[in-house]
Curated annotation (Swiss-Prot):
Listed InterPro entries: Ribosomal_Su5_D2-typ_SF, UDP-acyl_GlcNac_deAcase, UDP-acyl_GlcNac_deAcase_C, UDP-acyl_N-AcGlcN_deAcase_N
Binding site for Zn(2+): 78, 237, 241
Pfam families: LpxC (PF03331)
Pathway participation: Glycolipid biosynthesis; lipid IV(A) biosynthesis; lipid IV(A) from (3R)-3-hydroxytetradecanoyl-[acyl-carrier-protein] and UDP-N-acetyl-alpha-D-glucosamine: step 2/6
Function text: Catalyzes the hydrolysis of UDP-3-O-myristoyl-N-acetylglucosamine to form UDP-3-O-myristoylglucosamine and acetate, the committed step in lipid A biosynthesis.
Residues forming the catalytic site: 264
Gene3D superfamilies, A to Z: lpxc deacetylase, domain 1, lpxc deacetylase, domain 2
Record has Lipid metabolism as a keyword: yes
Protein's recorded name: UDP-3-O-acyl-N-acetylglucosamine deacetylase
């Protein structure tokens, strides 16, 4: 049986919020079977818990934000991408502020934290959402689609008319049956244009942003001294974001996601459209791991 997974141990980290610039204390904790991923604002009294579900997404400007009443948790997508990539079904994410720390702008530090905590299998079957037929949403020239696929695949295309992007790969397709999330996707950093960052700061956004946690591009070059981590790091980060956004379904996917210039808003619209169309998907489990189209790394001992 493919079993649900949680963390073996509690692990903590400190960082800053990309948009708020605030110092944030992050604690990842094991959670019981069928809990899902739950964000907890421990700076509030009483503590407010917000499950990582598509219906709890309230804002999608610059990042994916979970909302419950007037309480929010910003920038959940990179941590959720790491949870999805490592097959974590159940965990509590405690935060001392309203934003998940940006770390280095990728999912890499979160992968390291989760692997350091160790993975614990639980005595319950892991539930997958299998796409049964195509579902799509469009907005202008942007498009996001789910199609049936016996595995998990994410294809994405960006289209930036900018000197840094011309001649560089703007399309990528990752089939996770043959490609490692950790090696090929998790280290791709978020990116931004210097002109946009200056404007965002004037609006009290991106206050924590720097070349330490993002790829920063000016009119004709990448400003980061070390350059890019992957030749196609820009589009790979969009794949990383999409994986995090898709994990708001609450389960791992069996199917393919295709995005063309899609972002957090359209990704969430696609999830809501899928959820509402009960004939387009089904929940499945696997009694025999050998018959499953998706496999996960074996739980390693805690470091």
């Amino acid at each position: 049986m493919i079993k649900q997974r949680t963390l073996k141990n509690i692990i903590r980290a400190t960082g800053v919020g990309l948009h708020s610039g605030e110092k944030v204390y992050l604690t990842l904790k094991p959670a019981p079977m069928d809990t899902g991923i739950v964000f907890c604002r421990t700076d509030l009294d009483p503590v407010v818990e917000i499950p990582a579900r598509a219906e709890n997404v309230g804002e999608t400007t610059m990042s994916t934000t979970l909302v419950k009443g007037d309480v929010k948790v910003d920038t959940v997508e990179h941590l959720l991408s790491a949870m999805a990539g490592l097959g974590i079904d159940n965990a509590y994410v405690e935060l001392s502020a309203s934003e998940v720390p940006i770390m280095d702008g990728s999912a890499g530090p979160f992968v390291f934290l989760i692997q350091s905590a160790g993975l614990q299998e639980q005595e319950a079957a892991k539930k997958f959402i299998r796409i049964k037929r195509e579902v799509s949403v469009e907005e202008g020239d942007k498009r996001a689609v789910f199609v049936p696929f016996d595995g998990f695949k994410v294809s994405f295309e960006i289209d930036f008319d900018h000197p840094v992007f011309r001649g560089r790969t703007q399309q990528a397709s990752v089939d996770f049956s043959s490609t490692s999330f950790v090696k090929e996707v998790s280290r791709a950093r978020t990116f931004g244009f210097m002109r946009d960052i200056e404007y965002l700061r004037s609006q009290n956004l991106a206050l924590g942003g720097s070349v330490e946690n993002a790829i920063v591009v000016d009119e004709n070059r990448v400003l980061n001294e070390d350059g890019l981590r992957y030749e196609d790091e820009f589009v790979k980060h969009k794949i990383l974001d999409a994986i995090g956004d898709l994990y708001l379904l609450g389960n791992s996917l069996i199917g393919e996601f295709r995005g063309f210039k899609s972002g957090h808003a359209l990704n969430n619209q696609l999830l809501r459209t899928l959820i509402a169309d009960k004939d387009a998907w089904e929940v499945v489990t696997f009694e025999d791991a050998r018959t499953a189209p998706i496999s996960y790394m074996r739980p390693a001992a805690a470091v």
